[in-house]
Amino acid sequence: MAMDRSEIFGKVVDIASDVLGVDAGELTEETTFDDLDADSLDRLQLVTAMEDEFDLEIPDEKLESINSVADAIEAIESVQEA
């Protein structure tokens, strides 16, 4: 069963907090990974952690479009619905 958006948001925020060392309470869907000074390696670690957490694989063509918390949620939702 697919999770709802708020459950996905909570997990994405936890992952971003762990990987990037930021306060989860400061993150919103509008937060971009540039806002968090995430470089390309950080982004790769974020995606890998999300794939592990949600037990899915985000297609390579979606990786470049994941620039914010909302983008990450949408990528996860689209893979879950596929």
Model-flagged regions — what are they?
Residues D18-D35, D55-S65:
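Phosphopantetheine carrier-protein modules
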Residues A2-A24, V79-A82:
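Thiotemplate assembly-line natural product biosynthesis machinery
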Residues E57, E64-E81:
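C-terminal structural segments of small proteins and small subunits
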Residues D34-D52:
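Phosphopantetheine-attachment site and its flanking helix in carrier
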